């Protein structure tokens, strides 16, 4: 049997780190490059500074193994596709490597981008590599070798991080009639083997292969494949020590399978699924067990005493127990330091990225030097945990009693056919009605007004006047274009979740808590720390103003309870189902107020419905039960004549298709443009009988599709959905596009609808 490589074991590390910059420097630099305002050299200088500062901070904090190659201009799966020579042939005409990379990510006028979808059950999106018959895997290691050299040149104990071959293929997509990508696994082993030798030659002592797919049910053969692949990779004579990282759940049978290979280290997520039973895997003896006891996905301070108890149970099960985050800190903000508005109690409960690194170092020190060496830190942790438990903001008996009463009486609407008849009589819409999802471009005037209000340069009345002017222009634009159901454009909203969080009790909105959603898109998730309630109406004033400007229906726009949870940092001291119902009650009250104000169409967005779906099938039914229940609680307070819409994002919908039907929304809009309407076959198969709008163009690309292209998409949709139930819309909100792109695209979309209506 191949023997493990003997390298100095590490004791304190993290799985990965963010790359956007503490002040979103990379976002600004890449967007400047795309717009032609920033040169290549300026972009690369920003990237180099971010890498250097990140590595230096991690090493200075006390990590004895620092992840590198976690920097990305856009996405780590796209980086891996470049590494393996697996970019789609359609980007080959772009001669420049960086521009070719961005063409695959964003598309161009002539090139469609790669499909985008959620990274497991997180709010990060990855680009889906396409594996076709012509795909030939070849190694292109320039990026990882250059970053390794950079880090070693700084004296950093660098550990390159690379998506592992099993995860890469299981998350890729077959195209052009090719078989399942995982069938190509044997072809990847020589490429990864070559990479190992080059990394060793470049000075790498350790390499990390990320294999989160091993905690899922994506392939029943994954454990056996992992054993075979990593046994083969360990046979490379000239290689670094190999650390295989699993995260986002329990690796189950994959853990002993990996442990039977000669890999030197295995990482487990002890926050999201794995437990101390991993200590019972005898093959771990002689290896490093990397224990993910510090939560890399949520913002709550680690209970150091509990974590040390877990670590104590693991000691002796492996040659070394190293302390780590449960996953990359990509998913949490950089640091608590800029959050000057936090009250002392709430601050004491939290840990962002920098604080989590310190927690890792403290725990590793406790293992090395004994608990007395970190007695002050343990006492501080104990006090914070106790403070949180007794804070009165965490329990509102009145809200809990209302939820119990509504759930007991049944949160359901009337018969769908009766609702449709009532809504048709009220709305008088044409066949194939056109609409948009909600948001319109956030113009410079909007951003200036928001900044001026925040700085105290204008008062609330002036801010409202400016936002009303934006709404007036958006309504006028939609009427000129000929859309049938309008939206107010959401100029007053900084984010579809944060806007509501700022108005709901039980939330705290951060000042600088940015995390990457995809590419240059950053979000600032609010912190849901206590029981949720709605002190006052949140949207009625804006929507009724918009409705006063037109005779066409204007949609009320709300975010659904599951999405608010998915895109927030949620309290971890009670079941998610209970928290979802509290948010749902607040949304329910808002829908009733909108209806009372005369709004006939209300959209309750659930783009993240699938995002919280547990990775193991055995756990999914219970989640879908309470997620659907929360949506129905939020939407069942209105009459049959009020049309409820919902919107769903970036998903492999087949896994939740029954739940989509169970939501019982009158109209469901779905992101289907990048996946070529595939979801409609799934809906058709289950007899989905309500309205559906399967996104006729992809708003995440600057490309403006032609009217004929969208008409073709509509004709394809009509093969699965009858005309009386088909809606015409973009596949998502338009906030991230500019006005010219939106105007041209919507003009073509309306023209496409008219062409198809005319037959």
UniProtKB/Swiss-Prot annotation:
L-methionine binds at residues 437-439, 490, 605. Pfam families: Meth_synt_1, Meth_synt_2. GO terms for molecular function: 5-methyltetrahydropteroyltriglutamate-homocysteine S-methyltransferase activity; zinc ion binding. L-homocysteine binds at residues 437-439, 490, 605. Pathway: Amino-acid biosynthesis; L-methionine biosynthesis via de novo pathway; L-methionine from L-homocysteine (MetE route): step 1/1. The keyword Transcription does not apply. Zn(2+) binds at residues 647, 649, 671, 732. Its EC number is 2.1.1.14. Keywords: Amino-acid biosynthesis, Metal-binding, Methionine biosynthesis, Methyltransferase, Repeat, Transferase, Zinc. Residues 1-22 are annotated as: Disordered. It catalyses: 5-methyltetrahydropteroyltri-L-glutamate + L-homocysteine = tetrahydropteroyltri-L-glutamate + L-methionine. 5-methyltetrahydropteroyltri-L-glutamate binds at residues 24-27, 118, 521-522, 567, 611. One of its GO terms (biological process) is methylation. This is 5-methyltetrahydropteroyltriglutamate--homocysteine methyltransferase. It comes from Mycobacterium tuberculosis (strain ATCC 25618 / H37Rv). The gene is metE.
